[in-house]
């Protein structure tokens, strides 16, 4: 199983990814986490340090793949999770998608890519250009990390569009949303009510999760010293169990930007304005909850072309 984790920059994707990787390992799976961010800090809480990147290693070997061994690029992390950092090109030059491709190519040449039960790609921010959408080429499921905020759901909606596009040519499905650092979930619920998709879990705003990142450890590692944190780990184990059940997943249909603005802004408006916002969206997407039929291309085109007046 191959998973690609996306979401708005700073939303906590790496924290979710590391804890989810350990949760999957605790369920008996052999897990590899691949960081796909030029900052190369995805696996920091698993290994305790910034591991050398694939690009660093390739450069040191003058790109002679035959001189590279698995131990040169794969590092053991906490809980038996193996870790790889793809790295990235110099700032302002090159393409991150090329780096992801080179990483997969190298792992295949090392006969490592198919040795794992689960490979998890932790991907840079909400960038969904052709380059950083590259992990979707290899993934079975996409997971989108969001919170209950306006900007995070806008980013999630753009990622949904990328999943829909990639699913046309790849066996990719959206597994669902993961709410992170979320005290309330009204906007998340409003979004999935119109654009139907699973919500795998909603993690509340828990200070211990933030502190764990600062300490360079996962919740599961801190749990060994503080048993009272065990209940927090259950959130990640729940997500792992849902994924290991191999859900059917969905090919989602994103909302047009203006529709999404109208939908989410209606949360802060009067009842009369909210009713107007919903009627505008229903005019294009049909009854609420039917807006994500990926098969209805005509409806999709209408949604893209229709212009709504901001309230």
Curated annotation (Swiss-Prot):
Query: InterPro entries per the record?
Result: NifH/chlL_CS (IPR030655), NifH/frxC (IPR000392), P-loop_NTPase (IPR027417), Protochlorophyllide_ATP-bd (IPR005971)
Q: Which residues bind Mg(2+)?
A: 14
Where is this protein chiefly located? plastid
Q: A single GO molecular function, which one?
A: ATP binding
E.C. designation(s): 1.3.7.7
An example GO biological process term is: light-independent chlorophyll biosynthetic process
Q: Which reaction does it catalyse?
A: chlorophyllide a + oxidized 2[4Fe-4S]-[ferredoxin] + 2 ADP + 2 phosphate = protochlorophyllide a + reduced 2[4Fe-4S]-[ferredoxin] + 2 ATP + 2 H2O
State the superkingdom. Eukaryota
Pathway linked to the protein: Porphyrin-containing compound metabolism; chlorophyll biosynthesis (light-independent)
Q: Which Pfam families match?
A: Fer4_NifH (PF00142)
Identify the NCBIfam families for this entry.
DPOR_bchL
Identification of the protein by name: Light-independent protochlorophyllide reductase iron-sulfur ATP-binding protein
State the organism named in the record: Oltmannsiellopsis viridis
Q: Which gene encodes it?
A: chlL
